Amino acid sequence: MKNLFILLFLTIFICIPVIGCASDVKEHDVDIDFSDLSMTMIQAEYQRILSNSEDYMGKTIKMNGTYYSFQIDEAGNIAHFVIIIPGDDCCQMGFEFKRGENYVYPADYPAQNAMIQVTGTLDKHEQFGAVYIYIDVDEFSVISE
């Protein structure tokens, strides 16, 4: 009987914290939130991702920055980027992002140099004989034009 009481007590003791934490789980958990880091930490995390990109594939990234796009080939395909520009204008960092085929350029994109927020999953693609990493967008918003 004493063993049963101990087992019941431990079960309740272990389950209560787990049940209590369930309400803290967010629908869109972000693994790396660049929008909430200092510039030093942004640079460090960005370098870690570039150096070990395979470790970050499938991770959710949130990033605020400047929107930039340009035509990448003669077919007229456009690449879209979110760029972080440090205060001293040195060492700009950013990622290409893709919103999906339902979004048409330029109608569904902001003007060049608009401040944007991108949240999505890190992925990779091969183009022009090289492998590139990009953010597969789940959420996109314009902070300011």
Indicate where each model-derived feature is located.
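OB-fold and OB-like single-stranded nucleic-acid-recognition modules
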Residues: 6, 19-145
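Bacterial N-terminal signal peptides
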Residues: 8-17
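Positively charged n-region of N-terminal signal peptides that target proteins for export
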Residues: 1-5
